[in-house]
Amino acid sequence: MGRFKNNKKSRVIGKPIAKKNQEDVSHVTGDKIPKSFVFSRMKLAGPVKQLQMDLRKLMLPYTALSLKEKKRNTLRDFLNVSGPMGVTHFLMLSKTASSLSLRVARTPQGPTLTFKIHQYSLASDIAQSQLRPRCPQDLFKSPPLIVLSGFGSQELHLKLATIMFQNIFPAIDINTVKLSTCQRLVLLNYNKDTKLIDFRHYSIRLQPVGVSRRIRKFVQNHQVPDLRNLQDVSDFVTKAGYGSESEGDEEAATVTLSSDLGRVNKGATKSAVKLQEIGPRMTMQLVKVEEGLCTGGIIFSEYDVDGKKEKLKKKQDEEEEEDSEEEGEEGSEEDGEDMDEDFED
């Protein structure tokens, strides 16, 4: 007896990305706010699965944090759902026996950039390595800022990578942006010698210059400090400066605020900008660029064997042509000498 076929179409289930109080159009560019799906079309192991969740958290608030993917889901299923939900980018993790890769694609027609992940660290690994990890939930109410370093090359694949990363997060207007929304930073640094990209995710915090950690904690928490071991209240204010986690405030890392930010940082005063890594962290390499959505012509390939063979063959042909030209010149000189001898005879 044959098995009955299930004719029901497979669907991708996920919570809506945009809430009612969220804007769908950027007031800076006038275009749709970029939104993303982070998923995999295969079953991932424990650490790689957690890396996928860390990437989803990084892309908040304009992503589907609880996206449900099933084994039978195809890329077409995700594409069909992305249209009504306003999704503009796909981030797809894939794992083989020898490598881990991340594809970043623009919907619905591409292009697609494939990165080979050489090393990665989870957000939990970063937190465990820090003395005082800092990752409050309020950080993820606003999208991160994006900073690209070393991508000034004129090569086409690096230009495409620059445009892709710049458009994956909402644009900001430095004249109208609220300081309270600048809570996170994504940094991508390209090394032209190794062709590797260092991917880092930081939280941004401001500290008033010249104020000790004890005073900052007291103002922020509004809790009565423990003064049992002190002779006088002034000892609490004057004792020991910055604490183990901080260094002196460098002039280059200080800014003057235009408005109040929180309980401690007041407008028209100097504050020190502090970055603290929250993860995930990746070291990756751009290995392929495709014209379409995971398909189409290959614009760039780091492992383009056929292209390298063609270049090598072309170089060999040019060398052979040069050799033949030199031989021709030598032959003409010998013929000239023979003709002179004939005239003398």
From Swiss-Prot:
Keywords: Coiled coil. Residues 318-345 have a biased composition (Acidic residues). GO terms for molecular function: rRNA binding. Residues 308-345 are annotated as: Disordered. The keyword ATP-binding does not apply. It comes from the Eukaryota. InterPro entries: Brix, PPAN-like. Residues 307-329 form a coiled coil. GO terms for biological process: rRNA processing. Residues 34-295 form the Brix domain. Belongs to the PPAN family. May play a role in cell growth, differentiation and cell cycle progression. PANTHER family: PETER PAN-RELATED (PTHR12661), SUPPRESSOR OF SWI4 1 HOMOLOG (PTHR12661:SF5). This is Peter Pan-like protein. It comes from Arabidopsis thaliana (Mouse-ear cress). The lineage of its organism: Eukaryota, Viridiplantae, Streptophyta, Embryophyta, Tracheophyta. The gene is PPAN.
